[in-house]
Amino acid sequence: MAIKLFPVTPEFAAEVGDVDLTQPLSPDDRAAIKAAFWKYGVLIFPAQSLTPEQHIEFAQLFGPLEPNINSYQDDVKQERIDARISDVSNLDHSNEILKADARKRLSGLANRLWHTDSIFRHVPARASLLYARSVAPIGGHT
């Protein structure tokens, strides 16, 4: 079954329907998703429940992944999720809410502001993928 696109606006952002990202994508679906990304810039895949491996496999559709910033920090434990995924949550390696003075929490405060990931790199990131495990019941259409 071919994917369906539901544009949020005519030129920017689209919701993608009739696709299950837990299953291997057909070559046609892969091409359609890439084309939609280049057309709309933001794609929304609602109601997906991905494992870290499935998330990584889907992300690789857009190209090679850059190293996670936590891989450069010796004092940051990254045992909660796959080290190839940047953890921008408010949870520590034991799934407990971070303390107010935790380094990870303090360094992540800037993520609350609009920004473009990896724009400082010589070759900036082509895309960023956000996988929300908990979305606000009202107004959560980010």
Predicted regions and their residues:
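Fe(II)/2-oxoglutarate oxygenase catalytic core
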Residues: A2-T142
